[in-house]
Amino acid sequence: LIPSDPVLDRVLENNHRAGLPAHDVAANQGQFLALLVRLTQAKRILEIGTLGGYSTIWMARELPADGQLLTLEADAHHAQVARENLQLAGVDQRVTLREGPALQSLE
């Protein structure tokens, strides 16, 4: 039902190769997140827990040009993989990734 997306497929492969846990949302859940961003006309998004950036990419793609997504990731390895994936997907300019415990990152 959801067409294959070569970039998102590669992101999932990158996550697997990097040894990240397989906790990514399913494609239909990612599409639903994207729909929520579009319907609410969100300009700012806060995501707590980035993992490899898969859901981040789904949401960031739907942001307007002046939109911004802030995502928080406690694990340094996960954050590095996510940074690479965000760049691969071309959304790194709309996403700010803060590494460290979420409560400290929000201060």
Regions found by a protein language model. Give the residues of each.
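S-adenosylmethionine/decaboxylated-SAM
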Residues: 20-107
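Rossmann-like AdoMet
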Residues: 1-25
